[in-house]
Each structure stands twice: as C-alpha cells, then as structure tokens.
Design a protein with these regions (language model features):
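Bacterial N-terminal signal peptides that target proteins for export
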Residues: 1-9
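Metzincin-family zinc-dependent endopeptidase catalytic domain
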Residues: 112-258
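Propeptide-to-catalytic entry region of secreted or membrane-anchored zinc metalloproteases
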Residues: 23-166, 170-175
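Short linear motifs centered on Gly/Pro in flexible linkers and helix caps
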Residues: 21-22, 240
Length: 264
C-alpha cells in the first residue's frame, strides 16, 4: 500500500499556486492558445475514481490520527482546524534522458535551478525537496516517449526508492506535452510507473518559452502528492476536494482577472 505520507500530502499542499497553473488533464487543450504545447498530460480521474480515492484517503487519515486526539486539518475535503501535518523532506532522483549519442539532456545547473524553483513554490506547505542523485541515460526511445511501453521500460530500469521518493524524468517528449504525473493511489498497483515526467525544455534555462521557468514540475508534483486540478468536478460542490479553491467549469489559462464560470 502506498505510504501515508503521500496520501496525507494534500493536507499540507493548499498553498500551491495550482489555480494559476491549472491546465487540461487530458492533454488536448492548448496552453494560452499556443499550439506548440498541450500542457498537462496527467490522466484525469473519473468522479468514481475520485470518490474511491477520497474514501481510501480518509481511512488512512483516521488510522493515522487514531489515539492522537484532534485530527489534523485540511485533507481531501479541505476542512479546517486540528493540528498541522509534520514537515516532510522528500528525496528526489533526477533521471536525465538523452539521445543515443548523448545529446539533448538538461545540465546539472538546470537541475539545481529546478530544485530551487520547486522548493520555493512549496515553501510554507510543510514539504521540501532534496536532490539525492542525478543519473544520465542515452536512449533514443526513452528520449521521445509519450507513454506506453517505452515509458514503462524507462521507469523500470531507472526508478529508485519507495513511494516516499520522487523520481523525475526530463526528456524531449513528443506530442507537444509539457509533462505528466502519477497519483499516489496508482502506486500500489504500478509502483515502477510512479513519478513525474517533464519536458526538459520546460526547466529553467530551457527553450520552451514561455513555459521554461520550472513551473511545469511544480504543477506535476502537485498531482504526484495527490492534488487534482482546480476544475476537477466542474461546478460540483466538492470540486477538487479543497475547500479554499473556487469551483471552475473548465481550465483557465494565464491569469484571467474576475473569471467566474460557476455562478450562483
């Protein structure tokens, strides 16, 4: 079973700039009308999937808090009160993918800059990230993978650690995608598939302008920790299961002022 750390993670991640980063889950909507990129390719869960995950999350949360008095605040339902989650430091493994000839990979400076962006974004949430190791692999198939067998092969060969460790795979994925991630609930059935895949050019210093500031990883790590998009569930009352984010009927691109798609 996946670790309690990540299934409880949503309780500490409410400060993330996810509304500003919200993009399409299915990867078929262009970011800011820029046909060059399709933004987030993380699989959008069905409402039934969300319900089952929430039930599992609450069971783990109640078990963790059993006998410890007042339960912690936040959680999937975004409730308030209680104690704050304990700070957690997450070990990170970067697996840089290059072509067979060793071309196209990100630099160590980019990796370090990306780690800084990630930690800055999660400051105040109770989570911080420390780079444990960077590996380099030369493989044409992995270098352009958009999923399927080549992704499975890549992760099976490279992934390190348990459910608590974050494995990141920057490469030159095709299809115009900027990245995708697995949710904590996927770990039990597919532990080797766990992790985050991003376009290397989206990291600081990359050429995926205007998406080259490192925010793609921030966004995808939110999914890896258990957060949904702010438009999950549309205008339904529970929405993304976080009470302090307003419901949205659809994804918002950029930072539109005064946007309200769920009136009334």
């Amino acid at each position: 079973m996946q670790s309690i750390l990540r299934t409880i993670a949503i309780t500490a991640a409410l400060a993330l700039p996810f509304s500003a980063l919200a993009q399409s889950d299915n990867g078929y909507e262009n970011a800011n009308g820029n046909a060059k990129f399709l933004r987030c390719g993380t699989v959008q869960p069905s409402e039934l999937d969300v319900l089952l995950r929430e039930e599992h999350f609450l069971k783990l949360k109640n078990a963790k808090n059993s006998g410890k008095g007042k339960p912690g605040g936040g959680g999937g339902s975004g409730g308030s009160g209680g104690t704050s989650p304990q700070p957690a430091v997450i070990d990170v493994y970067f697996h840089v993918i290059r072509t067979d000839s060793g071309q196209g990979g990100v630099s160590s400076q980019q990796v370090n800059s990306q780690m800084q962006v990630l930690n800055d974004a999660y400051a105040g949430t109770g989570f911080s990230f420390i780079l444990i190791k960077t590996t380099y692999s030369n493989n044409d198939s992995w270098y352009t993978t958009t999923g399927g067998g080549s992704e499975a092969e890549m992760k099976a060969a490279l992934r390190e650690g348990t459910a608590d460790e974050l494995n990141i795979y920057p490469h030159n994925m095709g299809g115009g995608l900027l990245g995708w991630a697995t949710f904590p609930s996927s770990y039990a059935s597919s532990p080797t598939r766990d992790g985050v895949v991003i376009l290397g050019a989206s990291m600081p210093g990359g050429n995926a302008d205007p998406y080259n500031l490192g925010d793609t990883l921030t966004h995808e790590v939110g999914h890896w920790l258990g957060l949904y998009h702010t438009f999950q569930g549309g205008c339904n009352k529970t929405g993304d299961l976080v009470a302090d984010t307003a419901s949205e009927r659809s994804a918002a691109y950029g930072c539109p002022v005064g946007r309200d798609t769920c009136r009334g």
